[in-house]
Amino acid sequence: MSAFLAPETLEDPKNQTVVAGFNVTLNCTAKGSPMPSITWIKNNDPLAIQSNPRIKYIKTALDDKQIHSQLVIEDAKKEDKGKYHCVANNTVGEKASNPAFLSIEDLGETYAVYFFLT
């Protein structure tokens, strides 16, 4: 007979700064019994990956109680900056991770200037 355990986060996402146009990955690991599901939250709203093809979830079961989730943002843009956290949820309860802040640096366009000396 297995015991039921409320979710607990084992790995929280970390603060990151990424240059616009590059990919960024946020990680979250949780455990519980039954195994929790993980959802991602941005600025206190659930992320809807269906409306943004640049955002992907990768979920991996580590064993019968632990799950690892990656939130991958491809081609990061200014609008991706914000506060992110994950929420682990099962039939016993839910647990939110500590937040991580994602900053996007926009280096702008690069111009080459040539000087010709005569």
What is the predicted role of each segment?
Residues 1-118:
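Immunoglobulin-superfamily
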